[in-house]
Curated annotation (Swiss-Prot):
Top enzyme category: oxidoreductase
Taxonomic source organism: Mus musculus
Biological process terms in GO annotation: malate metabolic process; tricarboxylic acid cycle
Keyword annotations of the record: NAD, Oxidoreductase, Tricarboxylic acid cycle
Protein name per Swiss-Prot or TrEMBL: Putative malate dehydrogenase 1B
GO molecular function, one term: malate dehydrogenase activity
Source species, domain of life: Eukaryota
UniProt xrefs under Gene3D superfamilies: Lactate dehydrogenase/glycoside hydrolase, family 4, C-terminal, NAD(P)-binding Rossmann-like Domain
Keyword field contains Oxidoreductase: yes
SUPFAM superfamilies attached to this UniProt entry: LDH C-terminal domain-like, NAD(P)-binding Rossmann-fold domains
Residue ranges, compositional bias (Acidic residues): 489-500
């Protein structure tokens, strides 16, 4: 059987003439088969050079015709161009072509139009079936190992969304990345299309639609505070440049971890201004810690506690606000209907525990990073992404680090954790909540550290000076007690029913 491949520029008249002759031979000869390849004129030279280099041929003009010896795509024997094919047809089959130049030009024009339409159709189909491009930066950290199964569970992006996962880290972490890739493949997740790793900086975040920034895997703990702050700038500058250059224009960037999360988010926004509105910082980890401490005190589960608000620096000086906090399914003498809840502050009668032990426990957890391990960090990131794509539970308050635009009298230009809700693929700051205004002292304390972090990191301030707290003024404010218009133990806040 004679198997020929005819390739040429889509607008080449000689390709059109060779194609028509080959069609005639295939129609009339039982053992004559052809395969056609058209290339856009702009891509022809690179394509034919690659084919000739691969097969050790010497041919540059259009068309190029070769005979395949065995199977389609297998080893081939170069025949030549149009003239060689015409001579071959005359000698072997006694057939020639009498196509006029005018007809050749008409068919070449039609071929070009058809090629263009087919390419557009291919691009459209590719967009319909292309997987979601997810990148994880600093993927050599242990958090990544806990995060990957959550991303591939189908709960974050949906069971019908396929994922192409790329792990990015420094070159010295290549062995670790290779191991994680193999383990990820072993999961055999139905939503995983491909998984790979990248250690080449210039290729980072290529066509990324979701980027997860974790703590740097090579961070040192021997720096001074000022050195730590300044060391974040080069990496964030690099990431910002790469995201702007390589990522999809609607990329979603989520920053998680336990070290300077607000600062890193601020710097990324500064160095990637075109996608700044799509960069957020994860605060659900701190929120989860606060809920767990409350749950242990109230002898319930942390999942029953809702609407704890985290203000300020997610991984530093923050304010845990319980004024809107609720507990559902609480074991008490009176049981309400589904959706019934109690105010958390109305059920904790030990005010000294709230103002001292609770505050101190959270402060220790925040300052040391203890108990903020891989499981909690991964779950917080995955849950925030799920809310971003599918919306947060109706009526529920979520804490999120976003760029301040002056809401709640917070200075502009800093990333600040505040109450939000997710809906329709974005988030909305809940500025319409009642009785959650912050006192001037509390606001000054929370914003002061964030502003100093940014100034020190950018070299505008040499020394970081933590703002000293006044225990009498600020201990109660950590739970929001001194911010309420009504005392938490009042009858009005004891029991409520939430609209379903």
């Amino acid at each position: 059987m004679a198997k020929f491949v005819i390739a040429g520029k889509a607008n080449c008249p000689y390709y059109a003439k060779a194609e028509l002759l080959a069609d005639y031979l295939q129609k009339n000869l039982p053992d004559f088969r052809i395969f056609k390849i058209t290339q856009h004129p702009d891509k022809w030279e690179d394509w034919v050079e690659d084919v000739c280099e691969r097969n050790m041929w010497d041919h540059r003009t259009s068309p190029i015709i070769w005979r395949e010896l065995l199977d389609r795509g297998g080893r081939g024997l170069l025949l030549g161009g149009y003239n060689e094919f015409l001579e071959h047809a005359q000698l072997y089959y006694g057939v020639t072509s009498n196509m006029t130049t005018e007809l050749m030009m008409v068919i070449a024009k039609e071929n070009m139009q058809t090629h263009t339409e087919q390419q557009l159709d291919k691009e459209t189909m590719k967009d319909l079936i292309s997987p979601l491009q997810v990148w994880i930066a600093s993927a050599g950290t242990y958090v990544c190992c806990h995060l990957i199964p959550l991303l591939l569970s189908g709960e974050v992006f949906g069971m019908h969304t396929e994922i192409s996962l790329t792990l990015f880290d420094q070159e010295q972490r290549e062995d670790c990345l290779r191991s994680i890739v193999m383990e990820t493949q072993d999961l055999a997740s139905p939503v995983l299309r491909t998984v790979s790793f990248c250690t080449t900086v210039k290729e980072a975040f290529l066509q990324a639609q979701v980027i997860i920034i974790l703590d740097d895997s090579t961070e040192e703990e021997v720096y001074s505070l000022e050195s730590c702050l300044r060391s974040r700038v080069p990496l964030c500058r690099l990431y910002g440049y790469l995201i702007e250059k390589n990522a999809h224009k609607s990329v979603k960037v989520i920053v998680g971890g336990k070290n300077f999360v607000n600062l890193k988010t601020t710097l990324l926004m500064q160095y990637a201004p075109n996608i700044a509105s799509n960069i957020i910082a994860v605060a659900l980890g701190v929120e989860g810690q606060a809920k767990a401490v409350l749950a242990r005190k109230m002898k319930t589960t942390s999942a029953n506690i809702k609407d704890v608000i985290i203000w300020g620096n997610i991984t530093g000086n923050n304010y845990v606000d319980l004024r809107k906090a609720k507990v559902y399914n609480y074991e008490s003498a009176v049981k309400g209907p589904p959706g019934h809840y109690h105010s958390v502050l109305s059920l904790i009668f030990d005010r000294e525990w709230i103002t001292k032990e609770f505050v101190q426990t959270l402060k220790i957890l925040s300052s040391t990073g203890k108990q903020f391990g891989g499981i909690l960090a991964a779950h917080s990131i995955a849950t925030t992404l799920k809310y971003w794509y599918h919306g947060s539970p109706p009526g529920e308050i979520v804490s999120l680090g976003v760029m301040s635009e002056g809401q709640f009298d917070i200075p502009e230009g800093i990333v600040f954790s505040m109450p939000v809700k997710f809906e329709n693929g974005t988030w909305v700051v809940l500025t319409d909540l009642e009785d959650i205004s912050l006192s001037e002292k509390t606001l000054s304390r929370l914003t002061g550290d964030l502003i100093q972090e940014k100034l020190v990191a950018c070299g505008d301030l040499l020394t970081f000076q933590p703002i000293e707290e006044d225990p009498k003024d600020n201990e109660p404010s950590n739970t929001g007690m001194n911010e309420e218009k009504e005392q938490p133990g009042s009858d009005d806040s004891d029991e409520k029913n939430e609209d379903q």
